[in-house]
Amino acid sequence: MRLFPRWAEVLGLDARIEGWDIRLGAEAAAYRDTVRRLAGDPGVAGALVTSHKLDVYRHAGSLFDELDRYALLCREVSCISRRDGRLLGQAKDPITAGLAMEDLLGPGRRLDGTTQVLCLGAGGAGTAITVRLLEAEPAPGRIVVADKDTGRLATLREICAELGAGTVELARARGAEDADALLAALPEGSLVINATGMGKDVPGSPLSGRARFPAGALVWDLNYRGDLEFLRQAREQAGARGLELHDGWRYFLHGWSQHIAQVYGLELAPPAFERLAEVAEPLRQPTPARLDAP
C-alpha cells in the first residue's frame, strides 16, 4: 500500500500498514478469530475493513465493547479502534459519503427538494450514500436506489424505516436494460451515482451502451481505478448534454483519512486533509472524469 507510508510521514505517525486477508464469505469463526486476534495484540492500533464490513458486523459484532450509531444502523463495521482499553467498531462510510458529496457539489451548492437522485447499487457504499442523503437538510426530493440483489434492497428498506424515511424508492434492476429505464425517467439536473463496483471490482458498467444521461446531470462514479466504463459512457455524452463528471478519488481519500484519524485519535481539519490529498495525487490513476485524462 503505497499511500499509507506517505500519509504516516505527513501525520507524524510511527506506524505501518499490514494486510490481514480473509476469504470472501468465510465462516463465522474466521471473523471472530480475526477480531479476537486484533483485540489481543497490543501492537495493532486498529483496522480498516474493506470487503468484509457486513460480515464483521454479522459474525463478530458481539465482540466489540461499543458499536457506533452508523455501525448499528448500517449493519457494518468498517473501522476498528481502541479507546481506554475498549474495542470500538465504527461505520465511517456515511461520514465519508457526506464529505465526498460536499467536495463534489463545491462551495455554495446543495442538493434540495427539487433534486432527483439515482443510485445504482445498494451495497455498503450505496447504503451509506442513501443514509447521508436522507439526513441532509434539505434532503433531495426523490431518491431511487437500484440493485439486482433483493436481499440488499430488503436491508436498505429496513434501514430507511429505522430512519423514519419513506422517500426512497427501491428498484430491482436485473440488468442494464432496467438501469437504462430508471436513468431515462430522470429529469434534467439529476444526480446519477454508480455504487455497484462495476468498472473496478468487475469490468463494465451497470448501464448499456444505449443509456442516455439526463441533460445537466451530475455523474458520480465511486470507482477511481479500473476500466471505469460508466465514466467513459458519461464522457461520450458530456459535451452534448452538459454533464458534470466526478470519479471516486476524493471519496477514497476521505475514507482512508477518516479511518486513520479514528484509529489514531486525530482531528483532520480541511487544510490537513488537503495536504494529504496533495501528497496522494501522484498515485492517482488518470480517469475519464479528468480533463487531462488521455
Region annotations inferred by a language model:
Residues 89-94, 101, 105-137, 146-152:
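Glycine-rich adenosine-cofactor-binding loop
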Residues 110-113, 136-138, 185-187, 207-217, ...:
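Short, conserved loop/helix-junction motifs that constitute active-site signature segments
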Residues 49, 194-195, 221:
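Redox-cofactor binding/interface segments in oxidoreductases and associated redox assembly factors
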Residues 79-82, 199-275:
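Rossmann-fold NAD(P)-binding glycine/threonine-rich loop
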Residues 1-107, 226:
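Phosphate/diphosphate ligand-binding glycine-rich loop within oxidoreductases
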Residues 271-294:
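A short, charged, Gly/Pro-tolerant segment at domain boundaries
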Residues 138-166:
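NAD(P)-binding Rossmann-fold cofactor-contacting core
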Residues 39, 152, 172-207:
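Rossmann-like NAD(P)-binding element
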